[in-house]
Amino acid sequence: MESESARMSSAAEARFRINSPNSQPRAVKVIALDTPSERVVKELAQSPWQRATFLTASAFSGAPRQGERFSMGGWLNDLAGRTKNLVDEVESADLVVMVASAGENAAAAAIIGEACNVKRVMTTALILAPPPEGKVGVSDETLSKMLSALRPHAMMLVISSADEYIKDMLAALRA
């Protein structure tokens, strides 16, 4: 009996295959959640992209103090430092990629994830876990805490020990 893979790679099935890439690149918003990941996102932004926008949420300070009003637009910035409105950015996205460094504060992921959920925009969280200088890697406890913080707010979670992975992923998504 022929396997499904063998059958699908036959000449008879090849006529149904689509050999051209997606006709339109995805609008991807890449958001650094903390200061260390901001450096990586700024480096990524130097590459040529079709429809990728790079933002930072490292100015997010958590819930407003008692008596203060919460603003969706006061803490998200583009790489030039201009304030951006989270809802507007999410509405114009096909995918939001949140980049966080293991061991850092990723509190902004909750609000970004909620905005994406309301607008039905896919989310991915990338955890940067490069080994500290002279060490083998990030501790399991540190990774576990970060995974727990991001899991409720991302459809897909990826742990990366190299910054290049993000660039490769965005290229594969035709960002």
Language-model region placement:
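Glycine-rich, small/polar surface segments that engage phosphate groups of diverse ligands
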Residues: 20-79
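Short N-terminal or domain-adjacent regulatory/targeting segments
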Residues: 1-26, 80
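A short, aliphatic-rich alpha-helical micro-motif
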Residues: 87-91, 150-151
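Structural motif
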Residues: 30-35, 100-102, 128-129, 162
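Short, glycine-rich nucleotide/cofactor-binding loops
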Residues: 95-106
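Amphipathic helical hotspot of TIR/SEFIR-family domains
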Residues: 106-119
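Structural recognition of alpha->loop->beta junctions
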Residues: 134-175
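Short beta-alpha junction loops
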Residues: 121-141
